[in-house]
């Protein structure tokens, strides 16, 4: 894959995530790595409307190589994950159900599809201010042994061997959270 198809794929997946409600408004960000180049969505642009020419290309130090926009405010989060884990795609969403769990402090159970169920819940990292190096380092460390984590009071970060895999995992987390929310509500209602 070359950079041009990579920026096209980022836009396609960004539009898909937006259409599924995983990145409402101007929230969320995604990136993909090709060799030593990272392509990331810009800051302040809706993922539902982002265009290829708005995608920012950077090196692994975070130096901008191409693109007229500022990179996502969560650039350091993406860089830390790439430094700590051999993945090619990262998706950060603010989807309703998963973020609801993150804000309530309630954990999302691991269901089939999350690999071995040696751990009963998805990992949640403690709250840190969005866009900070503190959050970036916590996420980088938290994803060393996981493919997806929940950010307390914030959202979800999913990784994958490619961007499509990361986006499908983020979507699966949201559906899992939705199912668990519905089940918990129904368990407390008498018919």
Please identify what each model-predicted range represents.
Residues 1-191:
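Glycine-rich flexible loops
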């Amino acid at each position: 894959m070359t950079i041009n198809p990579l920026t096209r794929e980022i836009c396609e997946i960004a539009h898909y995530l937006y259409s599924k409600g995983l990145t409402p408004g101007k929230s969320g960000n995604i990136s993909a790595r090709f060799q030593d180049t990272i392509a990331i969505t810009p800051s302040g642009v809706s993922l539902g409307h982002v265009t290829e020419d708005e995608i920012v290309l950077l090196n692994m130090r975070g130096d901008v190589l191409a693109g007229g926009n500022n990179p996502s405010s969560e650039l350091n989060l993406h860089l830390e994950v790439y430094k700590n884990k051999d993945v090619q795609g990262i998706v950060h969403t603010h989807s309703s159900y998963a973020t609801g769990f993150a804000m309530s402090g309630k954990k999302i159970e691991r269901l089939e599809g999350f690999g071995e169920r040696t751990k009963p819940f998805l990992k949640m990292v403690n709250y840190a201010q969005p866009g900070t190096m503190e959050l970036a380092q916590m996420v980088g460390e938290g994803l060393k042994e996981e493919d997806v984590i929940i950010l307390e009071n914030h959202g979800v970060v999913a990784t994958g061997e490619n961007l499509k895999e990361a986006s499908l995992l983020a979507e699966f987390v949201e559906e899992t959270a939705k199912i668990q929310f519905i089940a918990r509500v129904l368990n407390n209602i008498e018919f």
